[in-house]
Amino acid sequence: MQENLKNDKLKIGKYEFDSRFILGSGKYSLELIKSAIEEAKAQIITLALRRANTGEIANILDYIPKNITLLPNTSGARNADEALRIARLSRELGCGELIKIEVISDSRYLLPDNYETIKACELLAKEGFTPLPYMHADLYAARAMRDAGAAAIMPLAAPIGSNKGLCAKEFIQILLNEIDLPIIVDAGIGSPSQACEAMQMGVSAVMVNTAIAEAKDIALMAKAFSLAVNAGRAAFLAGLASVSKAKASSPLTGFLRD
């Protein structure tokens, strides 16, 4: 089993990673990003292009180690066309082909627009991007995104930034059952135990931002999440015991009646 864990790779399109923990970068002070990455042992970090400007705000790219794979997102896009424009800008900045599609036109609940996201998947795939759509867990939408060229599906666990955990657990399980692509849980994970639970379900990876960025000790919380993700993955591979009724762990021999 140890050998299985060593060879257990996260595969997204043509890319392979040893770590199944994806780190968000949206709420950190720039000085803490590097330490969070190191403690998380993450190999992928998401990046909002609005934080990668070269103006008065320090460029976040200067704080991310060069061996880390960037996953730029289209945060701020309200429709598929805006997502495409942001993705093209990402490519011009040298951020590569991986792109997390975020299309949100709702400013109150910040829920992703699955319909526009499907359109964005098709547009970006045609231009050679490797799209990872952030979506509200829905089987029909996930199928459409897969058919449009998505390399992975990123359903939210709960509303973004809420830390409420696996509110969409049953719907995510349906995606696991029916979609033959990596399922990466994104948004709403608020504690290491919730990340572990998601990995035990069999999801391919977990992305966390707010729960780490708002912790009192960011680096330590990043480490805690990393350990939890690894533990959950190991438990899934080991095969969790499941029974529908009580079963004694020791034989009931009736020796007290002898």
Swiss-Prot record:
Cite the Gene3D superfamilies for this sequence. Answer: Aldolase class I
Q: What is this protein called?
A: Thiazole synthase
Q: Which residues cross the membrane?
A: none
Give the active-site positions: K100
Primary site of residence: cytoplasm
Q: Does the keyword Cytoplasm apply?
A: yes
Question: Which residues does the annotation say bind 1-deoxy-D-xylulose 5-phosphate?
Answer: G161, A187, G188, N209, T210
Q: PANTHER family attached here?
A: THIAZOLE SYNTHASE
Biological processes per GO annotation: thiamine diphosphate biosynthetic process
One example GO MF annotation: thiazole synthase activity
Q: What does this protein do?
A: Catalyzes the rearrangement of 1-deoxy-D-xylulose 5-phosphate (DXP) to produce the thiazole phosphate moiety of thiamine. Sulfur is provided by the thiocarboxylate moiety of the carrier protein ThiS. In vitro, sulfur can be provided by H(2)S.
Tell me which family the UniProt entry assigns to this protein: Belongs to the ThiG family.
